[in-house]
C-alpha cells in the first residue's frame, strides 16, 4: 500500500492533511469493514483519507436496493451494503475512490459533497477534451448518456465513507445482468472506450487530484493547455 499526505485548506483558511492511500485490489467486505472501523474510531483530530483501490468482481446493493434490479443470477456475489443508492457492479479495471472525510471540517453538506464528487470526474474528463455531465435525477457522471462513474455515500457521526466508482478499463459485461443504479436500460461506458490511453494508475491519481481541487476550491489546468 502506497501512502501520500497532502496538506490543503478549505474555505476556512485552516490547513488540513488529506492522506491518499493506494491499496491495490482489495476484497469489498475487507474495505467496507475498514471504512466502518475508521469512521467509528476517528476523532476531531483524525486526518481525512482518500483510498484508491479496485475490487474483485462483486455486485453491491445500496440501502434502497431492490432485488428485481438484479435481472439474472450469476457466480458474482451480491452484497447488501450501507451506502445510498441501488445496485451496481465493481470489478478489476474500475477505479474505486473511497472518501473518508469529516464533513464539519470541510463545511460540507451532502448535496455539496455530491456536486464536488461529480465535479472531480467531469474535470478529469475535461482534461481529455471529453464532455461529461452530472444528473439531478440519477446521481453519477455521464458521457453522451452513458454512465462512466457511480456515486454512493454513507454519513455517520458527521463523517462520510464510500465514494466514487470510475470505469477505466474493465469488463463491462456484468452490467448487463443488472439495472445499473436501478435504471432499466441505462448504458455504461469507460475511459478506454472513449479513447483515453492513460492507464488506471494515472487516472486514479488524476481523479484524486481533481477531487482535492474541488474540496479546496483550487483550479487545475489540464495538461497541454
UniProtKB/Swiss-Prot annotation:
The active site is at 181 (acyl-thioester intermediate). Residues 44-219 form the BPL/LPL catalytic domain. One of its GO terms (cellular component) is cytoplasm. Keywords: Acyltransferase, Cytoplasm, Transferase. Pfam families: LplA-B_cat. It is found in: Cytoplasm. GO terms for molecular function: lipoyl(octanoyl) transferase activity. Its main location: cytoplasm. Substrate binds at residues 83-90, 150-152, 163-165. It catalyses: octanoyl-[ACP] + L-lysyl-[protein] = N(6)-octanoyl-L-lysyl-[protein] + holo-[ACP] + H(+). InterPro entries: aa-tRNA-synth_II/BPL/LPL, BPL_LPL_catalytic, Octanoyltransferase, Octanoyltransferase_CS. The record marks 147 as: Lowers pKa of active site Cys. GO terms for biological process: protein modification process. CDD domains: LipB. Pathway: Protein modification; protein lipoylation via endogenous pathway; protein N(6)-(lipoyl)lysine from octanoyl-[acyl-carrier-protein]: step 1/2. Its EC number is 2.3.1.181. In the reaction, the free carboxyl group of octanoic acid is attached via an amide linkage to the epsilon-amino group of a specific lysine residue of lipoyl domains of lipoate-dependent enzymes. Belongs to the LipB family. Catalyzes the transfer of endogenously produced octanoic acid from octanoyl-acyl-carrier-protein onto the lipoyl domains of lipoate-dependent enzymes. Lipoyl-ACP can also act as a substrate although octanoyl-ACP is likely to be the physiological substrate. This is Octanoyltransferase. It comes from Nitrosomonas eutropha (strain DSM 101675 / C91 / Nm57).
Amino acid at each position: 500500500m502506497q501512502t501520500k499526505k497532502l496538506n490543503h485548506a478549505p474555505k476556512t483558511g485552516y490547513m488540513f492533511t488529506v492522506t491518499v492511500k493506494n491499496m491495490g485490489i482489495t476484497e469489498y467486505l475487507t474495505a467496507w469493514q475498514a471504512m466502518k472501523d475508521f469512521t467509528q474510531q476517528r476523532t476531531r483530530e483524525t486526518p481525512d483519507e482518500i483510498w484508491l483501490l479496485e475490487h474483485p468482481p462483486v455486485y453491491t446493493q445500496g440501502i434502497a436496493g431492490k432485488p428485481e434490479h438484479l435481472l439474472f443470477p450469476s457466480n458474482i456475489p451480491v452484497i447488501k451494503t450501507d451506502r445510498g443508492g441501488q445496485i451496481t457492479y465493481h470489478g478489476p479495471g474500475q477505479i474505486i475512490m473511497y472518501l473518508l472525510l469529516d464533513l464539519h471540517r470541510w463545511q460540507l453538506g451532502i448535496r455539496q459533497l455530491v456536486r464536488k464528487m461529480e465535479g472531480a470526474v467531469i474535470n478529469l474528463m475535461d482534461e481529455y477534451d471529453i464532455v461529461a455531465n452530472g444528473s439531478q435525477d440519477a446521481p453519477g457522471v455521464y458521457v453522451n448518456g452513458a454512465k462512466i462513474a457511480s456515486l454512493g455515500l454513507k454519513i455517520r457521526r458527521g463523517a462520510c465513507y464510500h465514494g466514487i466508482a470510475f470505469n477505466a478499463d474493465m469488463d463491462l459485461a456484468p452490467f448487463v445482468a443488472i439495472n445499473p443504479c436501478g435504471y432499466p436500460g441505462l448504458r455504461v461506458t469507460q475511459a478506454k472506450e472513449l479513447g483515453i490511453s492513460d492507464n488506471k494508475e494515472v487516472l486514479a491519481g488524476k481523479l484524486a487530484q481533481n477531487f482535492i481541487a474541488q474540496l479546496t476550491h483550487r483550479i487545475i489546468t489540464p495538461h497541454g493547455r
